[in-house]
Design a protein with these regions (language model features):
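ALDH superfamily catalytic-core signature
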Residues: 7-160, 182-185, 224, 252-318, ...
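Short beta-alpha connecting loops at secondary-structure transitions
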Residues: 37-41, 104-107, 174-176, 239-246
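Conserved glycine-rich beta-strand-loop-beta hairpin in the small C-terminal domain of fold type I
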Residues: 149-153, 167-174, 193-198
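Short hydrophobic alpha-helical runs that function as membrane-insertion/retention elements
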Residues: 199-203, 222-223, 367-370, 391-393
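Conserved phosphate/anionic-ligand binding catalytic regions in large, soluble enzymes, centered on
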Residues: 232-233, 237-254
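A short, charged/proline- and glycine-enriched loop
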Residues: 336-342
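Short hydrophobic alpha-helices that are characteristic scaffold elements of the AMP-binding
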Residues: 361-362
Length: 470
């Protein structure tokens, strides 16, 4: 099932298919790409004119009806008033009307129900005393269409706090919060705490701020000194994490493999190697992530099958790698693979449990095991570098623990029950890999988080690589 839409409908779909298995006895694949509480952080070093242009495109293009659209503009206190004054002026120059005309900037929302929901939200904010600004360029031709169409004027709502916005408003409504420079880490934590992680923008000329935001934000697509919409296939692979989507990213190397029931284990590695021949891969982080796997490989000296699996998974693992993607001059696009935080591993056989452990350690994730005799005994026997990556939890309520991926070995009835229990959870959709006892073809790419970063290098003075062209 491939789905684009709301988080609520994606959750219903997952619960609907959780009780079904395919012809091979595996869970039905679900790729869900949902919405987000997308923010843009603007500090005092940003160029205001460029910020306004990018905010208009990100918040109001397609009448704000893009899943990637900007929903919350976060302005540093020192430049908030000046930026808002210029933004209000720009909004007042926008023409709203028939999108078939080239002179139109903002078209209608999709239907009358959407219009009513958006207007209800705006009225709720007004009743709470929040400043609301609406403006559009007056034109008699457009005005006639407003009466018969489902139009909502571009709207600016000032909030006291990011947490005031509890859900995505899918339309031409931009919320604004102000922040103190010293409170930037807390602001990023608030954005992460929303649970959504689709797009995030940052406008700044300070490299340290770029590194701080991109290094700590839990979002699938990050944009620096540019707008946040219009991702291009193969240039900015698109898709979120958490409540914003299951992965893999559309337009990225992992997507088509998610649709295959069977494929060679090395297929993804071959695909990436072909790409790496043209653009070198940065794998500095991978070495640090795989240290526990190396410890498990040494411990398995008398277990040749497990040792061979450790070697195989270690060679196939791609977590901790960053790749430069093709793109226009003046823009730098990278695609990074990171490990999921914690993987629930369920098995009733020691060899299967160790197979799961090797796969999870290969990508650098933590392991969640049921607290039973089999797994307690294994934890005691394993080296400390490995056992430190394992958490035990009571088996009867283990699905209530935090985890973002599942690997299961067992029979189909147990697998179906596990899928239903995982689907019944609140929060982000979690995918389950199911295998019969003894299988070792675990798909490591299902344990990755993908991050796309698009940087407007021209905004910081130009593309220095052009100087090397001879």
């Amino acid at each position: 099932v491939m789905f684009t839409g709301s988080t609520e409908v994606a959750t219903l779909l997952q619960r609907n298919i959780a009780s079904r298995l395919d012809a091979q006895g595996r869970p039905i694949p679900l790729i869900a790409e949902t919405g987000g509480m997308n923010a843009m952080i603007v500090d005092s070093s940003a160029l205001t004119e460029q910020v306004v242009i990018d905010v208009l495109a990100s918040a109001f293009d397609s009448a704000g009806q893009r899943c990637s659209a900007l929903r919350v503009l976060c302005l540093q206190d020192e430049i908030a008033d000046h930026t808002l004054k210029m933004l209000r002026g720009a909004m007042a120059e926008c023409r709203m009307g028939n999108p078939g005309r080239l002179t139109t900037d903002i078209g209608p929302v999709i239907d009358s129900e959407a219009k009513a929901n958006i207007e209800r939200h705006i009225q709720t904010m007004r009743s709470k005393g929040r400043p609301v600004f609406q403006a559009v360029r007056e034109n008699s031709e457009d005005a006639r269409e407003w009466q018969s169409g489902t139009f909502v004027a571009p709207t600016l709502i000032e909030l006291d706090d990011f947490a005031e916005l509890q859900k995505e408003v899918f339309g031409p409504v931009l919320h604004v919060v102000r922040y103190n420079r010293n409170q930037l880490p807390e602001l990023i934590e608030q954005i992460n705490a929303s649970g959504y992680g689709l797009t995030l923008g940052v406008h700044t000329r300070i490299d340290e701020t770029i590194a701080q935001v991109t290094g700590s934000a839990h979002v699938g697509n990050l944009y620096v000194n540019r707008n946040m919409v219009g991702a291009v296939v193969g240039v900015q692979p698109f898709g979120g994490e958490g409540l914003s989507g299951t992965g893999p990213k559309a337009g990225g190397p992992l997507y088509l493999y998610r649709l295959l029931a069977n494929r060679p284990e090395s297929a993804l590695a071959v695909t990436l190697a072909r790409q790496d021949a043209e653009y070198p891969v940065d794998a500095q982080l991978k070495a640090a992530l795989t240290q526990p796997l190396n410890a498990l490989r040494e411990w398995a000296a008398n277990r040749p099958e497990l040792q061979a699996l450790c070697t195989q998974y270690g060679e196939l693992a791609q977590a901790g790698t960053q790749r430069l993607l093709p793109g226009p001059t003046g823009e730098r696009n990278t695609w990074t693979l990171l490990p999921r935080e914690r993987v629930l591993c369920i098995a009733d056989d020691e060899q299967d449990a160790l197979t799961q452990l090797a796969a999870v350690l290969a990508v650098g994730s933590q392991v969640l095991w049921p607290d039973d005799a089999l797994h307690r005994q294994l934890v005691k026997a394993l080296p400390s570098a490995v056992s430190e990556r394992i958490q035990l939890a009571k088996a009867e309520n283990i699905t209530a623990q935090p985890f973002d991926a599942v690997i299961f070995h067992g029979d189909s009835d147990q697998l179906r029950a596990l899928c239903e229990a995982v689907a019944a959870r609140d929060g982000a959709i979690v995918s389950v890999q199911g295998f019969t006892r003894g299988e070792s073809n675990i798909l490591l790419e299902r344990l990755y988080i993908e991050r796309s970063l698009s940087v407007n290098t021209a905004a910081a003075g130009g593309n220095a690589s052009l100087m090397t062209i001879g």
